[in-house]
């Protein structure tokens, strides 16, 4: 009996290793308010100005949210530029984020536009590629 217990103990210790542990990140890690922080163009990082950093993506538990953009105008200063509704989902590796424009521009009714982004959370930043060599980096509040 002692030999069987010893064999089972050794088998248990040998069969488990750190490599077998898989870190699973929850899909709701994105929930909260993420402010514009930095952006990257051609592998060069730059910091958004104070006005742009007031803007954010807000992700809610129900898969909806808002994108809020501020713009610094030399005449009027830092002003709210746009607010868009969004929907988000998580496929296990990246976030699918869709923003929807309100269907008007400068008071003129037009068709609505949907923008689609794919983002990943890395080093406490939500990184969203937005162009060929461009990425916006948002930091959670």
Q: Can you describe what each PLM-predicted range is?
A:
Residues 4-13:
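Sec-dependent N-terminal signal peptides
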Residues 1-4, 17-18:
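Positively charged n-region of N-terminal signal peptides that target proteins for export
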Residues 17-85, 89-141:
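Lipid interaction determinants
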């Amino acid at each position: 009996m002692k030999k069987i217990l010893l064999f089972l103990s050794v088998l248990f210790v040998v069969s488990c290793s750190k490599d077998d542990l898989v870190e699973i990140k929850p899909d709701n890690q994105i929930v909260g308010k993420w402010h514009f922080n930095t952006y990257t163009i051609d592998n060069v990082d730059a910091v958004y100005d104070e006005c742009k950093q007031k803007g954010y993506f807000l992700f809610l538990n129900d898969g909806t949210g808002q994108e809020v953009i501020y713009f610094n105008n030399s005449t009027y200063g830092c002003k709210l530029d746009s607010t868009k509704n969004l929907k988000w989902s998580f496929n296990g590796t990246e976030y699918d984020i869709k923003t929807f424009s309100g269907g008007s521009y400068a008071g003129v009714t037009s068709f609505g536009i949907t923008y689609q982004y794919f983002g990943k959370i890395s080093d406490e930043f939500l990184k969203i590629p937005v162009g060929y060599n461009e990425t916006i980096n948002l930091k959670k509040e």
